[in-house]
């Protein structure tokens, strides 16, 4: 995992507190090496079978690895978010949002072990439709659990 929890939380809080219009801090875990940053753009996307199948495939990788590693029962909730931010309309970027919470009113992003993250990233990077993968490192508050 890229860095220590304390430093990531400090940076995330600094960003979201300094710019009130920013409510998320995400870390890029992977970008397809064949795609340049300037090639990634918002794409028009619909909630159709093909897109949902892609989301389910990515989510299944994450959930399988969480189960295998024993982390599934340690996190309160995990969301896999499909972003229409890609090089073309048939591709997507995804955000991982595992959180830990005891009272639902507050939550911290789950700091998954490096080996678990590496397994997840490696498998997702093999999928031909994935242009980028991010990790939501925002606590609640200021962020909510879900993405709207």
Tell where the protein language model's regions lie, with residue ranges:
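ATP/NTP-dependent adenylation/nucleotidyl-transfer catalytic domains that generate, transfer
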Residues: 1-148
